Design a protein with these regions (language model features):
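Short, surface-exposed, low-complexity cationic segments
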Residues: 57-71, 312-319
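Acidic/polar, glycine-enriched structural segments that form the non-catalytic walls/loops
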Residues: 23-26, 31-36, 40, 137, ...
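Bacterial N-terminal signal peptides that target proteins for export
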Residues: 1-12
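Mature N-terminal segment immediately following signal peptide/propeptide cleavage
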Residues: 24-65
């Protein structure tokens, strides 16, 4: 899937460069910043596959991969949604920051304060979004940080090729620019709540969910499954987060501590912040949320990229207006599970 997605990206990029006359950059049809970021997002996922969206400030929102339209799901206080973070060390600097722009003032005032997941984590001070479907780029910067980050999202869409336009994948590239005259040790990690089985009717993962580490031909990553859910449920299935990158040090975890008073994300954050790597939690009681991390060196005044892909397989699509009739998904006939799609 990674090679297929990259080939599709190259084909689309060639067309886009001709169309938008942007030889070295991703194409841009519109630019958004300020208040506009609150309402813009790039849906990523093939035709008829569902989607995950890259928001204007870099969050991953609108998780609609389990056969149910569900705008705003995991955008608000439905627990800790998946997120990416960056740790930077070098040039007299050390910090850990969520890879997302600032929270809008309109999101701060609710019954219990801010209702945005991970609202207490440090974020980049500035964000803007450039879009030209199927491409979108979030630009992150902060005067207090020695790096700038571009988050490049890509949805599989190849005009004239319905098969390659119908893949259950959301592709992401995190390009880090070193603004200093010294090399920087940079780690990018993803915290992934095991949301398999959480289709919006239920915010809590069903009992028996599993998270496992896998390796394949040119790809490594995590697979999240809802093992004990009714296998006829539209929410039964799996999703995966993987990377084709081999030029860095990879670490991961397949479990986190239980979420008492938001302890899950805090313990994960502390683990990542300590050395830019992930390790298994020091706890006898765990839950199947996971994370994957890649540490690289970004040269002085240089740029380095991290590549990730979310894939999924939830085969039991119900008929429109009749949940008792399962019509299925075309993509599920081609892939046994989410890892097979990776």
């Amino acid at each position: 899937m990674h090679r297929q997605a990259l080939n599709m990206f190259a084909a689309c990029a060639a067309v886009a460069v001709t169309t938008f006359a942007a030889a070295a950059e991703w194409p841009t049809a519109r630019h958004f910043d300020g208040d506009h970021l609150l309402r813009v997002a790039l849906p990523m996922g093939g035709i008829g596959c569902g989607s995950v969206s890259l928001s204007g400030r870099g969050d991953l929102v609108d998780w609609e991969i389990m056969n149910r339209a569900n705008k705003n799901y995991f955008n608000r206080s439905a627990g800790s949604r998946p997120f990416f973070a960056i740790r930077v060390k070098g040039a007299g600097h050390e910090s850990t920051t969520m890879l997302a722009g600032p929270i809008h003032p309109a999101e701060l005032y609710f019954a219990h304060g801010c209702n945005v997941p991970q609202c207490g984590l440090p974020r980049f001070a500035e964000a803007s979004f450039d879009g030209a479907f199927p491409f979108g780029t979030v630009h992150l910067s902060d005067k207090g940080l020695p790096v700038k980050v571009d988050i490049k999202g890509f949805s599989p869409f190849v005009p004239g090729n319905s098969a390659d336009s119908s893949l259950p994948v959301a592709s992401l590239e995190y390009e880090v620019e070193n603004m200093t005259g010294e090399p920087l040790e940079v780690s990018i990690c993803a915290y992934v709540r095991n949301i398999a089985g959480c289709d919006g009717r239920n915010d809590s993962p069903p009992a028996g969910n599993t998270t496992t580490y896998r390796e394949g031909e040119g790809v490594r990553g995590l697979v999240f499954k809802s093992e004990k859910l009714n296998k006829n449920s539209p929410a039964w299935g799996s999703f995966a987060l993987s990377t084709p990158d081999a030029d860095g040090k990879l670490s991961y975890r397949t479990a986190c501590v239980p979420n008492h008073w938001e302890r899950t994300a805090l313990e994960f954050w502390d683990d990542f912040s300590s050395d830019g790597e992930l390790s298994a939690p020091d706890s006898a009681e765990t839950i199947p949320h996971g994370g994957i991390c890649m540490k690289k060196t970004v040269p002085a005044r240089g740029r380095t990229s991290w590549h990730w892909a979310f894939t999924w397989n939830f085969p039991n699509r119900p008929a429109w207006g009749d949940d008792s009739k399962i019509v299925g998904n075309w993509y599920s006939k081609n892939y046994a599970d989410a890892w097979d799609a990776a």
